[in-house]
Amino acid sequence: MDSPIQIFRGEPGPTCAPSACLPPNSSAWFPGWAEPDSNGSAGSEDAQLEPAHISPAIPVIITAVYSVVFVVGLVGNSLVMFVIIRYTKMKTATNIYIFNLALADALVTTTMPFQSTVYLMNSWPFGDVLCKIVISIDYYNMFTSIFTLTMMSVDRYIAVCHPVKALDFRTPLKAKIINICIWLLSSSVGISAIVLGGTKVREDVDVIECSLQFPDDDYSWWDLFMKICVFIFAFVIPVLIIIVCYTLMILRLKSVRLLSGSREKDRNLRRITRLVLVVVAVFVVCWTPIHIFILVEALGSTSHSTAALSSYYFCIALGYTNSSLNPILYAFLDENFKRCFRDFCFPLKMRMERQSTSRVRNTVQDPAYLRDIDGMNKPV
């Protein structure tokens, strides 16, 4: 991902993940907007551009959004992981994938305080090591999340369209193995981000950048290559697979009235499929804008307006907001998660409700007795 400092410039600039992107100074003109870099690669057209003024309110608003994402996302995703570990009935194949998604989201929310600080200070004050860690977490989240959602969609496709094969494929153990493979595959990008990530002092605007550092001679080539790879492998291919899976599932659901031998099982199957579809749809909605921005910038079709730059910041914020939305979706759309959340948050109330339900059940099951005029108990 491009640094906002350089994204709308014609010359090479540091490429970074969204978490490492540095915003311009909220109270100043856009740093380095029309200034050529040290190798003089900026063209005369760039040099004539008027600098864009960014409202001081934008970094404050984004920081407020990140603060909410940090609290809701970290607490919510931690709670999701806890209930899956705590309750045996929650250890299903689908929930194992949800655990993986919650883990990736919880990790990326831990970077929110660092990003908020950068937005307010317009510089990276945390050193080189933390820079590498934050960039790496960001790329891990990006790839792990979309790969997990893709596997969740494939999992639902098998459950709906191939119920017999699902008995062998859809097991918690195999879901755990697939999750491990997802993290190993994402490591090809995450480890590369650790190696390439680092800090760089920009003396012309007196800021420290945290970004991916490519060789200066081939910077433009590596920058474009990275953007295209991220767009294709972290967005286009997974989304196409998801679309195919859900298209086939919709056709299957329309063609049969009863997917399984039981109406209860059929309701559960459709309910879980709907949950996964909503989670996937929300992810795509949240991340599509920033991917489009990056693709447009890579193709050189960029706008130099203040509105475009402001939109870019909010697209980044929208992507991170997704990490705090999933626990809310589970709570509203899945009865099992809702029940477990209530059990954790209100243990005394839930215990009393279970005891009350148990007493009612026992009363219904036991025969009622009436006392006759002789004082003898007779069942009714």
From Swiss-Prot:
Keywords: Behavior, Cell membrane, Disulfide bond, G-protein coupled receptor, Glycoprotein, Lipoprotein, Membrane, Palmitate, Receptor, Transducer, Transmembrane, Transmembrane helix. Glycans are attached at N25, N39. Signal peptide: none annotated. A lipid is attached at C345 (S-palmitoyl cysteine). GO terms for biological process: adenylate cyclase-inhibiting G protein-coupled receptor signaling pathway; adenylate cyclase-inhibiting opioid receptor signaling pathway; behavioral response to cocaine; cellular response to glucose stimulus; cellular response to lipopolysaccharide; chemical synaptic transmission; conditioned place preference; defense response to virus. The chain crosses the membrane at residues 58-85, 96-119, 133-154, 174-196, 223-247, 275-296, 312-333. The keyword rRNA-binding does not apply. Disulfide bonds join C131-C210. It is a multi-pass membrane protein. Interacts with NHERF1. Interacts with GABARAPL1. Belongs to the G-protein coupled receptor 1 family. G-protein coupled opioid receptor that functions as a receptor for endogenous alpha-neoendorphins and dynorphins, but has low affinity for beta-endorphins. Also functions as a receptor for various synthetic opioids and for the psychoactive diterpene salvinorin A. Ligand binding causes a conformation change that triggers signaling via guanine nucleotide-binding proteins (G proteins) and modulates the activity of down-stream effectors, such as adenylate cyclase. Signaling leads to the inhibition of adenylate cyclase activity. This is Kappa-type opioid receptor.
